């Protein structure tokens, strides 16, 4: 899983403070990282904003990327024309079974998602590592504090745990551990405490 690679997008280097001198260096690093992790038999879900405008350059890059490539369309993705056949699927939203775990895929964060209370994971992009991402994280913490599981994970390539590389679900969950749920009783005490107020 990965999002927001923005191949060929000069401005995103400054926007994300990416460690690349130019788009050529960024594109080559993204391709190398991808191919070091992805085999010809692997499936990779790109959660939007894969490329920036130049169709011919995008095709050249797609030809170099290993694996079965699936696009969850983002606001910058163009899915018509010559690039379309290089994607095995193109969806606005998807639900996949990853080793018997339900994973919800969208370019945009969905705060209330299917089977949230039953362990489903929601992967998203779009917000990069901006104030919007911080707001999603704040909301997640508030949900966990109320005993509501909220496993939203930003798979934008610029996130430290992504390091411009596609990641497995296990890697994402390890890098984004769930906090301990503290259920609050109607009387205001923590359900994890004993009568002495100790955990």
Language model: regions and residue ranges:
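Short, glycine/acidic-enriched loop or turn micro-motifs at the edges of active sites
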Residues: 7, 52, 77, 110, ...
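A general structural motif
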Residues: 41, 66-68, 100, 118-119
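Conserved beta-sheet core of the metallophosphoesterase superfamily
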Residues: 85-183, 187-188
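Metal-dependent catalytic neighborhoods of phosphoester/phosphodiester hydrolases
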Residues: 47-65, 73, 78-92, 114-117, ...
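N-terminal active-site segment of His-dependent metallophosphoesterases
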Residues: 1-58, 149-151, 155-160, 192, ...
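Short, conserved, surface-exposed binding loops centered on an aromatic residue
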Residues: 34-36, 60-64, 95-97
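Active-site neighborhood of phospho(di)ester-bond hydrolases with catalytic His/Asp-centered motifs
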Residues: 2-3, 44-49, 69-75, 105-106, ...
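A short, conserved beta-to-alpha structural element at the edge of catalytic cores
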Residues: 22-37, 67-84, 151-177
């Amino acid at each position: 899983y990965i999002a927001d690679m923005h191949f060929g997008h000069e401005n995103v280097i400054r926007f994300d403070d990416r460690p690349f001198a130019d788009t050529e260096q960024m594109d080559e690093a993204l391709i190398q990282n991808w191919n070091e992790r992805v085999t010809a038999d692997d499936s990779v879900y790109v959660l939007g904003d894969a490329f920036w405008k130049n169709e011919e350059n995008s095709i050249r890059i797609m030809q170099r990327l290993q694996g079965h490539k699936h696009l969850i369309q983002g606001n910058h993705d163009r899915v018509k024309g010559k690039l379309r056949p290089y994607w095995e699927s193109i969806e606005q939203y998807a639900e996949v079974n990853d080793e018997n775990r339900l994973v919800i895929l969208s370019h945009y964060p969905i705060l209330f998602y299917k089977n949230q209370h039953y362990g489903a994971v929601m992967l998203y992009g779009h917000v990069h590592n901006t104030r919007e991402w911080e707001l999603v994280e704040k909301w997640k913490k508030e949900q966990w504090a109320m005993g509501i599981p909220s496993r939203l994970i930003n798979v934008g390539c610029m996130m430290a745990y992504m390091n411009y590389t596609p990641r497995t679900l296990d890697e994402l969950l390890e890098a984004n551990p769930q906090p301990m749920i503290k259920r609050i009783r109607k009387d205001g005490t923590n359900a994890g405490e004993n009568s002495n107020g100790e955990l």
